[in-house]
A protein has these predicted regions:
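Substrate-binding cleft/loops of secretory-pathway carbohydrate-active enzymes
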Residues: 145-163, 230-256, 333-353
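A metal-dependent hydrolase metal-coordination microenvironment
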Residues: 27-237, 307, 328, 519-520, ...
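Histidine/acidic residue-rich metal-binding segments in metalloenzymes
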Residues: 195-224, 237-254, 275-292, 304-320
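C-terminal functional module detector
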Residues: 26-38, 46, 50, 56-60, ...
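Bacterial N-terminal signal peptides that target proteins for export
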Residues: 2-11
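Bacterial N-terminal signal peptides
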Residues: 11-21
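Short, solvent-exposed beta-strand-terminating loops
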Residues: 77-83, 159-162, 260-279, 515-521
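Short, structured patches in soluble enzyme cores that scaffold and shape functional sites
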Residues: 227-229, 262, 356
């Protein structure tokens, strides 16, 4: 049986600050990174199987072309009427469709539990054969009961032939899957029960995945929530901070993060479908009367939950939660063909540090999934950086992203080391139509952001705190411009910063950009990102050009505990 952070949490029982932090820290990557390799990926993309506009094979080819080391086919649950080449299922002879009869667009649909198992997975196996150096995961975009969407994937026990686990998850828990034909079916994952209506059902789904992982029914999995601000608060179909806390409590080893930077980065609102309008004074409000301004568009291509210093993500981190941040393409249709998207890997990448645990010189699906869970990851726009090491050190104790450093008392001299590298060029191509000019990817400055860790919040004892999406202790404690770093013999930029007399538990995270503070309509006086809608309104710059002008990266946190 796998070591479960959930069981350790139960033992800690939300006691003191330190016992609470131990409960959350007992996962992978508790120390500095072991020998491994940085691998780039994208786990949210669409094909003709659902609402994408290009074939399955085309999207796999583009993922490879843009240099991704790994990716997941992750598209909507529910039911669809066509296959990955756009052929209607009911034109097959014989008709292969199983389950309850339903129609969409005049054609019979196939429920996703079947297409995932019987059609998509064989194509994933073909993809693995075609690109043996890459890793193509089996996943889907979960329509979360009571909420919006979520990227999921499972590494099955028998990867040569078995996609039944992801099929069982989709059938039971996807709110758009109305099929009832498999109710009471006995599977290796238990008896199937339809549980797909309420928030409580979504929590049960996370619990189910956690149980499968703990009990060895599956080798690995992730549940990472998608474009989290798009539908606003939970009352309008989105998410509140307490929802993420519930999911993480139920599945700490599988439900461990969200997409801080949504896909659809060529969209007018850099990923969101709801408008944010700004007046001549720069005051911005949502077009939806019942939603606050933070749900309209993005801030430097990043959602408000992540971009706001001291906001929702920082509230999660302030508990010491291993809750990590990722980015994807959410590719449906390329902007040059009338869509809102870059190809997978063309603009946004999630970088994962994978450890070669079995020493075979390759990186397995398990090792990549473990790397995501470890939190030793970061994401970047437009290849602003293609390498990042972020470490905290106290004497001989060291921790990297996602890890923890534990000190017996106050730390006299906490050493923060940042090592990063930018490429000479990225995938921007000036064509005179969509993009007039391309700047080299170059970091202007990096912010070191810190907040206090006060421990897990008990929803029964502190209900108001449990629903509070803020962390007022979070602040930018240092900003590093080009004169703050040196270049080593490998061409990496290196920053060393010392924090004296650390006498309380804190987390540290990074964000960096190619833009200077006070860049008109892009950043404020101290360098915080402004609403992307300002650039559209005031300068008329939109689409791909806006995205290539405005590049950011975000690290995941390091946790430092002082007893």
């Amino acid at each position: 049986m796998k070591k479960s952070t959930k069981k350790l949490c139960a033992i800690a029982a939300l006691g003191t600050l330190f016992s609470s932090s131990l409960c959350l820290a007992a996962g992978p990557n508790a120390n500095a990174a072991s020998e491994g390799k940085w691998l780039s990926g994208d786990f949210h993309q669409h094909t003709l199987y659902t609402d994408g506009s290009t074939t399955f094979d085309f999207v796999m080819e583009k993922s490879n072309e843009f240099g991704l080391d790994w990716w997941a086919n992750s598209e909507h649950g529910g039911g669809r009427n066509r296959d990955g080449n756009g052929v209607f299922w009911d034109t097959y002879i014989p008709n292969p469709i199983l389950g309850n009869y339903a129609v969409s667009g005049g054609h019979q649909i196939m429920w996703r539990w079947q297409s995932l198992r019987d059609f998509v997975y064989p194509q994933i196996l073909d993809t693995r054969s075609l690109y043996p150096e890459r890793r193509a995961f089996s996943g889907f975009e979960w329509n979360v009961p009571g909420h919006e969407h979520c990227s999921t994937a499972i590494v099955a026990k028998d990867m040569a032939e078995d996609a039944s686990a992801i099929s069982a998850f989709e059938y039971q828990f996807d709110k758009s899957d109305k099929d009832t034909s498999r109710n009471s079916e006995n599977t290796p994952y238990g008896t199937l029960t339809k549980t797909n209506v309420t928030h409580a059902d979504a929590v049960t789904a996370c619990q189910w995945m956690q149980d499968q992982y703990e009990d060895g029914g599956i080798d690995n999995a992730w549940i990472i929530f998608a474009h989290i601000e798009r539908n606003g608060i939970a009352a309008t179909g989105g998410y509140d901070v307490n929802d993420f806390r519930d999911f993480n409590n139920a599945g700490p080893d599988v439900a461990f993060g969200f997409e801080g930077a949504p896909g659809h980065q060529v969209n007018t609102f850099r990923g969101f479908g709801n408008a944010l309008t700004c007046d001549e004074n720069g005051v911005c409000i949502s077009s939806e009367e019942d939603e606050p301004y933070d749900f309209g568009g993005t801030y430097g291509g990043v959602g408000y939950y992540t971009a706001e210093v001291g906001g929702l993500w920082d509230a999660m981190l302030g508990e010491g939660r291993r809750w990590f941040n990722f980015a994807n393409s959410d590719y449906h249709k390329h902007y040059t063909a009338g869509g809102d998207d870059f190809y997978p890997g063309e603009y946004q990448k999630t970088w994962v540090y994978a450890v070669d645990k079995d020493g075979d010189g390759a990186y397995s699906y398990n090792e990549i999934a473990d790397g995501m869970r470890s939190g030793n990851t970061y994401f970047a726009h437009g290849d602003l950086i293609t390498h990042l090491e972020f470490e905290a050190q106290d004497n001989n104790r060291k921790a990297s992203m996602g890890g923890e450093l534990v000190a017996d008392g106050a730390i006299k001299n906490l050493k923060i080391k940042i090592t990063f590298k930018s490429p000479e060029t990225n995938n921007c191509v000036a064509d005179g139509t969509y993009i007039s000019a391309c700047a080299e990817p170059k970091v202007h400055h990096i912010d070191l952001i810190a907040g206090d860790i006060t421990g897990l919040i008990d929803p029964e004892k502190e209900p108001e705190a449990y629903t509070d999406p803020t962390n007022p202790t979070t602040r930018v404690i240092a900003t590093f411009a080009a004169n703050s770093w040196e270049t080593d013999k490998n061409g990496n930029n290196v920053i060393v910063y010392h924090l004296k007399d650390v006498d309380k538990s804190m987390y540290f995270r990074l964000r960096g950009t190619n833009l200077a503070p006070n860049t008109p309509d892009e950043t404020d006086a101290v360098g915080n990102p402004l609403p992307d809608a300002l650039v559209t309104r005031n300068q008329g710059i939109d689409g791909a050009q806006e995205a290539w002008n405005d590049l950011w990266f975000y690290s995941n946190p390091i946790f430092v505990y002082v007893k």
